[in-house]
């Protein structure tokens, strides 16, 4: 399901609104944080304070709390970029007239999940060598006769299912929210057009329900950005400390 | 909007099949954002955090140092005060002892001086009395002789005789005096 392209107008494959929004999100995030960080003072102004609070949230509440240790600073840029990239692209869905969460198109979610997938495998191999794959799939303290069952499960859950759920969770929630808002809007439009007054009146119920769904969607948009970043931090932490799991 | 849904539904495309162009845009956009974050945003924020932590910790360290210095100075002052008190006590004791010593010396000296003066006076009085006696003896003798010669009209110019007479007279006098004194 793709919106018509902007360039060339209406074509199936071309420069679409979704692509424009993705590029715009990069500009918004970079501009905001560069402005907030530009004039750094020990006692921050309003903009700097907002930037520091946002940066500190990812740095301390996600990276430091999950990864911890003295290594966590290495992964702050990735987590920070992921969180705000997904957050802004999701919030698009809650802004009137834009109303298109970029990740309701599955391609972007695949790309981000793939980046994270390759990153945590690379970290695990770099940290533990090639035996990382053994550490990640053979749990310690399990009786030998259960291992033939456990090892395939671990391989499937860690290396096959994990990136799929990571990407589809984001994509599906955004698409579902997008569809619900869109269907509610169309439904209201359809009901208002009816000749029957009683039927016309039910559009109010749909409107109330749509507003509630809109609030819920706005919450889920922020929440999914957090969940995606949190899971990334958990995967990285698991790869770093594979020997102690 | 109806049109969109209908077209989406009738299009029959699978929503799980990605558009490669969109993937490319997301990848490129994320790469640019990541580069900016790594290169500028994180270092700038971390620099501020570090500076702020240093400012706070530096302030605390400075305050602790000042506190330590102040208590050291207080200790020193207390020590000096104690020393000064002890010194003052010592000086006072010394002065007291010295004063007593000086007083005793002076008393001794005064006593000696007075004894000396007394002895000297005694000696002088004795010698003056002696001189007076001698001179009196001579004068009184002459006077008495002249008087007697006048009275008795007898020439008593013979000195030896006269002296004998006078001596006898004086001896009588002394004997009388001595008898009276007794």
UniProtKB/Swiss-Prot annotation, chain B:
Entry similarity comment: Belongs to the ATPase B chain family.
Transmembrane spans: 25-45
Protein role: F(1)F(0) ATP synthase produces ATP from ADP in the presence of a proton or sodium gradient. F-type ATPases consist of two structural domains, F(1) containing the extramembraneous catalytic core and F(0) containing the membrane proton channel, linked together by a central stalk and a peripheral stalk. During catalysis, ATP synthesis in the catalytic domain of F(1) is coupled via a rotary mechanism of the central stalk subunits to proton translocation.
Subunit structure: F-type ATPases have 2 components, F(1) - the catalytic core - and F(0) - the membrane proton channel. F(1) has five subunits: alpha(3), beta(3), gamma(1), delta(1), epsilon(1). F(0) has three main subunits: a(1), b(2) and c(10-14). The alpha and beta chains form an alternating ring which encloses part of the gamma chain. F(1) is attached to F(0) by a central stalk formed by the gamma and epsilon chains, while a peripheral stalk is formed by the delta and b chains.
Protein name as catalogued: ATP synthase subunit b
Topology term for the membrane: Single-pass membrane protein
Cellular compartments annotated: Cell membrane
Source species taxonomy: Bacteria, Bacillati, Actinomycetota, Actinomycetes, Micrococcales
Domain of life, per lineage: Bacteria
Organism (species): Arthrobacter sp. (strain FB24)
Entry keyword set: ATP synthesis, Cell membrane, CF(0), Hydrogen ion transport, Ion transport, Membrane, Transmembrane, Transmembrane helix, Transport
GO-annotated cellular components: plasma membrane; proton-transporting ATP synthase complex
InterPro entries assigned: ATP_synth_B-like_membr_sf, ATP_synth_b/b'su_bac/chlpt, ATP_synth_F0_bsu_bac, ATP_synthase_B_chain
Pfam families assigned: ATP-synt_B
NCBIfam families with a match to the protein in the record: ATP_synt_b, PRK05759.1-3
A GO molecular-function descriptor: proton-transporting ATP synthase activity, rotational mechanism
Main localisation: membrane
